[in-house]
Amino acid sequence: MKAKEIRDLTTSEIEEQIKSSKEELFNLRFQLATGQLEETARIRTVRKTIARLKTVAREREIEQGKANQ
């Protein structure tokens, strides 16, 4: 998911995406440990997506803080 797509989501949708991505990452790591994971690059892409989601969420937090001052 690209940053532009993430910025179009609402804050609650971003939180849901973070939650589902973390679950997916957990499952991918479990598959890696058991030797069932074929597409190992998927772990990296999910981690990057989580980072992008968290970055946009933090940007919104900072914007709200500035608006309240």
From Swiss-Prot:
GO terms for cellular component: cytosolic large ribosomal subunit. Coiled coil: none annotated. One of its GO terms (biological process) is translation. GO terms for molecular function: structural constituent of ribosome. The keyword Ribosomal protein applies. Keywords: Ribonucleoprotein, Ribosomal protein. Pfam families: Ribosomal_L29 (PF00831). The keyword Ribonucleoprotein applies. Belongs to the universal ribosomal protein uL29 family. This is Large ribosomal subunit protein uL29. The lineage of its organism: Bacteria, Bacillati, Bacillota, Bacilli, Bacillales.
